[in-house]
């Protein structure tokens, strides 16, 4: 049966339930247990044994096996699954005053996907399956759409992200990923709060987009008649709080950057930024180690983990090494020895580093060499320290190395996971750096920062020596859940509209069959599609949007591949 036929059949069942006086969309249910509790509590119950303890449980029917006077359902709740043992005589006796034909109605009017509440006792069947031996049932929600085929599951990756609710139903490991994400963020907050850090929320809508080199999303406030930006970082407002007298502050929240999408990047993502007065980047390294190792131990119970087949040892202390030394280690280039940019470019080209001609300074060339030749090799936790000043406009100059700043980035499995500075507190130096950024912005650099005059005013009132830290929550969750893509750890990642991925389509006039191939490789046939609909699709400026509005859900279809 097609999905539309299944939906139509289930709608008929909805009407039948209503005619029987049953509301197929109940108001509430009182459970006494969850599936996992029962599985644990009665793990030692012998086959064939029954416990005279009445329980009430609710969940989604994941599978049905129906016989003459017996039926076996698999019920899934948030914690796991348990079998329902459904005996006609027992149910009819218990529900005689409610529904004289309760067992047959259960067989005929329920489907996999429905949400069911049951009351009964605990029994382990002769085959060894722990079960709720049902006395009474209540249909709590009648589903209209079928779950994915139980053998093949939901395997279309794009559909998994697009219909995360279905992904969560059929893939328990996905639910576990988001449980762990919640445990990780709670653990980070707990770690910081135990050390007297205070979480303070800062604006998402900002008049200046600052705190990072990134392209912002732009919006407009109608009443104030002003352009606003979704924040690209929480840094500048948290620093204002340090100026105001708070000594330990943080914010764990959403950041928005109008940039590309990849397995490591989503335009909307989560970070935590932490600022501590009277501290420097050495203190932030210790704090970073403490946060990540504590959370890993709490959530996973170990510091020896595996990421995509690669063993990772999170045991501190982690390696600390300068960017200069790493570039020399992996390329043989000693950037401390170069006297001119041209000399550095020539040596870099000889070392096979791409994009050398675009570099405008030795510092930027050093960073390019690091990104191209070093980053991917930093598998074990590594603090890369002492960055060029050109790429770090908000960091304090290095106290002993001219041209560098006191900054580190934490790399694990070849990707940046954290970033930290000894924060720049000199308002004159900060103004000069931001004005240089503003010149780049005026010249067309969409990622350069502007001059935030209010932030500079705050610095002129005096900011104490401060250490700052940012950790990418999504990447940390990826690491601790062994997830290959950032989309696997964001519940609802940003995706192109489904209709916009039409690759090609064809139309058979005689049978009025429209065949559409999507970029994902899926091919669908839509039946009894009038020629006028096909002509409108031909002429539509956005075929994907036209498909979503005028074809999807309007015609019977069959998936060919």
UniProtKB/Swiss-Prot annotation:
Its required cofactor(s), as named, are: Mg(2+)
Q: Which UniProt keywords apply?
A: Aminoacyl-tRNA synthetase, ATP-binding, Cytoplasm, Ligase, Magnesium, Metal-binding, Nucleotide-binding, Protein biosynthesis
The subcellular localization recorded is: Cytoplasm
Query: Which HAMAP family does this one have?
Result: Lys_tRNA_synth_class2
Source organism? Nostoc punctiforme (strain ATCC 29133 / PCC 73102)
Q: How is the cofactor bound?
A: Binds 3 Mg(2+) ions per subunit.
Q: Which family does it belong to?
A: Belongs to the class-II aminoacyl-tRNA synthetase family.
User: Any idea which positions bind Mg(2+) 2?
Assistant: 416
Q: Which PANTHER family match?
A: LYSINE--TRNA LIGASE, CHLOROPLASTIC_MITOCHONDRIAL, LYSYL-TRNA SYNTHETASE
InterPro entries hit by this protein: Aa-tRNA-synt_II (IPR004364), aa-tRNA-synth_II (IPR006195), aa-tRNA-synth_II/BPL/LPL (IPR045864), KTSC_dom (IPR025309), Lys-tRNA-ligase_II (IPR002313), Lys-tRNA-ligase_II_bac/euk (IPR034762), Lys-tRNA-ligase_II_N (IPR044136), Lys-tRNA-synth_II_C (IPR018149)
Q: What Pfam families does its record include?
A: KTSC (PF13619), tRNA-synt_2 (PF00152), tRNA_anti-codon (PF01336)
Per UniProt, Mg(2+) 1 binds at 409, 416
Oligomeric state and interaction partners are given as: Homodimer.
Q: What is the lineage of its organism?
A: Bacteria, Bacillati, Cyanobacteriota, Cyanophyceae, Nostocales
GO cellular component annotations of the record: cytosol
Q: Identify this protein by name.
A: Lysine--tRNA ligase
Could you give a single Gene Ontology term from the biological process aspect? lysyl-tRNA aminoacylation
Q: Which GO terms describe its molecular function?
A: ATP binding; lysine-tRNA ligase activity; magnesium ion binding; tRNA binding
* Reaction equation(s) it catalyzes: tRNA(Lys) + L-lysine + ATP = L-lysyl-tRNA(Lys) + AMP + diphosphate
